[in-house]
Every structure is written in structure tokens, then in C-alpha cells.
């Protein structure tokens, strides 16, 4: 086969594994949700901050597995100056870098929120993506646990602002210092036990996955999974295991507080942690946040390896059906805690900090389950059709389109092949356009337009069976002077809105055509 006979190979359109395209509905739903979150954060006095998607890899701290080839866990590339850069793994490490780099200009305590995508170079799976959005809030430079208490209250207020009612969520609070006290009390204090302490932390982090029995094996000799793979345990004896399981198994802090205080009584750090938990509990209760909203709960174990003090988690308590058809509690949608060591990595001096992160995609799934998201109405644009292609006619069509837009009405002029008018109406139907504007030569000569109610027209064609019904129905197409274009379109859109409300609520609601397209919230 010669070169002339060879067909060029078509490039295959492929979405990279672990990534998703976001369509208009999802984008609008996220925007609706994040606007409500942002409003709560602003009311608490937090200010926005934006950091780049890339950071120097060494700024990511514990996520740097290999200084020569840092490509595990993060997406990395080497700059032209041979320095490694990585897509951010979370929003906290970039904040720490920003604070350290601008420490002399920042007013402490520094209260900030950030929203954006983070990236994980991990094996993708169902519901597990390599790019996802987080929404964080942090206070840097506030050493007192009142800052942690405020974070918990802000998390509760955020969930309620999104429509999640009390009883369907709880903010659970624990303290890393209490666990440190427990570990010291069972003989795992000191630098020489650091490795064993780390194994204990990793074991109890699996509590949700393996339950108390599985964690007991990981705390002791080790655990073999279904495939036969063996995970070596932390090597604790039965008495040590029982004390650790008592701590992470506490469900009623009030009933267990005395015994817990006795367990850590000989450790300064453990006693301090218990005092901090009690202080947080007293603060939130005084502010009107009872245990139905914010609960001291030592069973919160996620992130204890990372945090240095209080740790908190937002959990949704209602049931959903999983992929297997089983009823399960929805679970965590965000969490955080105190991380006093992260900023100080750059500073060489202690810089206290606390904050939390909301998993936007997971929370959006929860809100859709509750019917709290995506209900806001998005009206497709009015379509100004094109009957003639000369400059004068095109100018008129564009002028009409701009008049509608200036009045706050979504509008577009048809940009396809205008010579086949039927295709324009097909486009309008598939697009879901509520109204079409038509002006041919005859209409242009008398300065009028045809205004076609596409929603009513579709209903009439499907429902009306006799002439009497037709006469009683709303007019689906009418002629109007060009000067009345905006007013007539508003009138039709208002009538359509009333029809939608009547269909949704079962009764007619009054409407004011003058308010359609009005962008003033106080109108």
C-alpha cells in the first residue's frame, strides 16, 4: 500500500483513569453548595485564600516517599532547574507554606478558607478518584482549644446551612493527647517506642474497617486477611490491648470520663488532653451546641497519626443503600484537628494551627440523597432564530438578543446553519429553550416579532384533543411589536414558572411578569 492509500489514524478520545468530566448540572450543584459553605465561613470572620495547584514536592512533607523519584502518592514533575514539583495532595500543606513564607505580613491569628482540587496518585476505583475537591477552613496562630471548639461549631452550622437537620449529623471530637497518655500508661512512652506507637496508631485507624476484633489482632500478634496476606501486629499483650480498646470503644464520654482520667492519671500529656476535651465540651454547650450536635467521642481515630491535639469529624447519621443493597450509615463527610507541627517545619519555631476539610464530592452525594441539592431552577436560554443572513437582519437579531440579556433574561442567537429553519426549532427543543423569537422579512417590514412559547406549544400538541380545549389554552405563539419584546417574553416566562409551581404544589400561585429576569434580590 502506497502513502496515498494510507488513512490517517484517528486519535482515540480517552479520559484518564481516575478522573471525571463535570457537566453543567454537577457544576451548578457544586457552586450552589460551596456558596452556602462560603457564607457560613464569612460569617465566622474567615477570609479566602488561593494557592497554586503545584508546590515544591518537599513542601508536602510526609507525602514525599522518594527524594530521587517522588511519584508515589503525588503527581510530580521536574522543573528546568531540576527541582521537583508536585500537584497538591491537600490544601493544608500549601497553607503551611504560605503562612511560613509570608509570616511577617500575616496578622495572627490568621483565619482563612480555601476551596479547590487536590490530586492523589493512587489506584482509582469505584467512588475513588485521583482528582477531587476539598473545602477547608483553618486558624493559624491560636493555641487555645477555644479555636478547636469554634471549628466544631462552624462545621455544625455549615451542615445545617446546607439543609441537613439536627439528628442527621453529629460532630465527634477526640484528642490525640489522650491517646498519647493511654500509650504512655501502658508502657509505650519514650523515643525508643516510637515505631511501636506508630503501629498502634495505624492499627486503631482500621477500627471502622476491621472492627474491635480485627484491631485487637493488629495490636497483638498480627492479622491475616481473606487472601492469606499477613500484617504484622504491634506486639502488645492482652492487658495493653484491653486498655487501648477501652479508649477507642468509649461511646458515652460522660459515663467513661472518670475511668479514662484514672487510666491517664500518671501522664501529663494524657491529663492535659482530658482537660482539653472537657473544656471543648463546656464551651460548645455554653454556646448552645448540645451532644446531639457536637459530641466528645474517643472512638474518633482517623488522622490521629497526623494531628497533635483535638481531632474532630463530621458524620452524617442517616441510612443509605450501598452498592450491595444494604442499609448503611452514610458516615464521614469531613474532619480535621490541631496540627501544631506543620507550619513549624518551615519556621523552626512552634506555630499552632487547627482546621478542617470538607470532602465536597462526598457531601454533594449526601445532599442529593436528602434531596437538598440540585433543586434550584435553571431556565435554558430564549432562542432568537435567524431567518435572513444579511448584515442588516443579523444586526437586528443580535440587538434583540442583547436587549433580552440586558433585562436579565438568558438568551442566545442561533449560531448554526440558519438556512434550515426546522433545524433551529429542533435545536431549541433539544436544548430545552422556553421561548423562540422569530422575525422574517414580513415581520421586519412592520417592526414586529413572532414569540413562540415552546413549553406551552409542546404541551398543547400532546394534550389538546378538541377545539374547545384549544381556545381555553394559553396562546402558544403571538405577534408583538419589537418594542414590547422584553415585556412579552417576561410574561411568557412568568406563566411558565406558575405552571411549574402549580404542577409541583398542586395549586396556582400569583406571579408578577415584571420580576422575571430581575437580578435585584430585593426587588
UniProtKB/Swiss-Prot annotation:
Its EC number is 6.1.1.21. It is found in: Cytoplasm. Its main location: cytoplasm. It comes from the Bacteria. Keywords: Aminoacyl-tRNA synthetase, ATP-binding, Cytoplasm, Ligase, Nucleotide-binding, Protein biosynthesis. Pfam families: HGTP_anticodon, tRNA-synt_His. GO terms for molecular function: ATP binding; histidine-tRNA ligase activity. One of its GO terms (cellular component) is cytoplasm. Homodimer. Belongs to the class-II aminoacyl-tRNA synthetase family. HAMAP family: His_tRNA_synth. This is Histidine--tRNA ligase. It comes from Rhizobium johnstonii (strain DSM 114642 / LMG 32736 / 3841) (Rhizobium leguminosarum bv. viciae).
Amino acid at each position: 500500500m502506497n502513502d496515498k492509500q494510507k488513512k490517517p489514524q484517528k486519535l482515540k478520545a480517552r479520559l484518564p483513569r481516575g478522573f471525571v468530566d463535570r457537566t453543567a448540572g454537577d457544576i451548578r450543584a457544586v457552586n450552589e453548595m460551596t456558596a452556602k459553605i462560603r457564607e457560613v465561613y464569612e460569617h465566622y470572620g474567615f477570609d479566602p485564600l488561593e494557592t497554586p495547584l503545584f508546590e515544591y514536592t518537599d513542601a508536602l512533607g510526609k507525602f514525599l516517599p522518594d527524594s530521587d523519584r517522588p511519584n508515589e502518592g503525588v503527581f510530580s514533575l521536574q522543573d528546568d532547574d531540576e527541582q521537583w514539583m508536585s500537584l497538591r495532595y491537600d490544601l493544608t500543606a500549601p497553607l503551611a507554606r504560605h503562612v511560613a513564607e509570608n509570616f511577617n505580613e500575616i496578622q495572627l491569628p490568621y483565619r482563612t478558607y480555601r476551596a479547590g482540587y487536590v490530586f492523589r496518585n493512587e489506584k482509582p476505583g469505584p467512588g475513588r478518584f485521583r482528582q477531587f475537591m476539598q473545602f477547608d477552613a483553618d486558624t493559624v496562630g491560636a493555641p487555645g482549644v477555644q479555636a478547636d471548639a469554634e471549628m466544631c461549631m462552624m462545621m455544625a452550622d455549615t451542615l445545617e446551612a446546607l439543609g441537613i437537620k439536627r439528628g442527621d449529623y453529629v460532630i465527634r471530637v477526640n484528642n490525640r493527647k489522650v491517646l498519647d497518655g493511654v500509650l504512655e500508661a501502658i508502657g509505650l512512652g519514650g523515643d525508643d517506642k516510637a515505631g511501636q506507637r506508630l503501629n498502634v496508631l495505624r492499627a486503631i485507624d482500621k477500627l471502622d474497617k476491621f472492627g474491635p476484633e480485627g484491631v485487637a489482632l493488629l495490636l497483638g500478634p498480627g492479622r491475616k486477611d481473606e487472601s492469606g496476606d499477613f500484617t504484622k501486629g504491634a506486639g502488645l499483650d492482652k492487658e495493653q490491648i484491653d486498655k487501648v480498646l477501652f479508649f477507642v470503644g468509649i461511646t458515652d464520654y460522660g459515663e467513661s470520663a472518670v475511668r479514662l482520667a484514672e487510666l491517664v492519671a500518671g501522664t501529663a500529656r494524657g491529663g492535659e488532653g482530658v482537660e482539653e476535651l472537657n473544656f471543648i465540651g463546656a464551651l460548645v454547650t455554653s454556646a448552645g451546641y448540645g451532644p446531639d450536635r457536637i459530641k466528645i467521642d474517643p472512638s474518633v481515630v482517623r488522622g490521629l497519626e497526623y494531628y497533635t491535639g483535638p481531632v474532630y469529624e463530621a458524620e452524617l447519621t442517616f441510612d443509605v443503600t450501598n452498592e450491595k443493597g444494604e442499609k448503611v450509615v452514610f458516615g464521614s463527610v469531613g474532619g480535621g484537628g490541631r496540627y501544631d507541627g506543620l507550619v513549624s517545619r518551615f519556621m523552626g519555631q512552634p506555630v499552632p494551627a487547627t482546621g478542617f476539610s470538607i470532602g465536597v464530592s462526598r457531601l454533594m452525594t449526601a445532599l442529593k440523597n436528602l434531596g437538598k441539592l440540585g433543586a434550584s431552577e435553571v431556565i435554558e436560554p430564549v432562542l432568537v432564530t435567524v431567518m435572513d443572513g444579511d448584515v442588516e437582519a443579523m444586526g437586528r437579531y443580535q440587538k434583540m438578543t442583547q436587549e433580552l440579556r440586558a433585562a436579565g433574561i438568558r438568551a442566545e442567537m442561533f449560531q448554526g446553519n440558519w438556512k434550515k429553519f426546522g433545524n433551529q426549532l429542533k435545536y431549541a427543543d433539544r436544548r430545552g429553550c422556553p421561548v423562540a423569537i422569530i422575525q422574517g422579512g414580513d415581520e421586519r417590514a412592520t417592526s414586529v416579532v413572532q414569540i413562540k412559547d415552546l413549553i406551552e406549544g409542546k404541551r398543547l400538541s400532546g394534550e389538546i384533543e378538541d377545539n374547545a380545549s384549544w381556545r381555553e389554552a394559553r396562546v402558544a405563539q403571538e405577534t408583538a411589536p419589537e418594542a414590547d419584546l422584553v415585556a412579552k417574553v417576561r410574561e411568557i416566562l412568568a406563566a411558565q414558572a406558575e405552571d411549574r409551581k402549580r404542577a409541583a404544589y398542586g395549586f396556582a400561585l400569583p406571579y408578577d411578569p415584571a420580576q422575571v429576569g430581575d437580578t435585584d434580590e430585593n426587588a
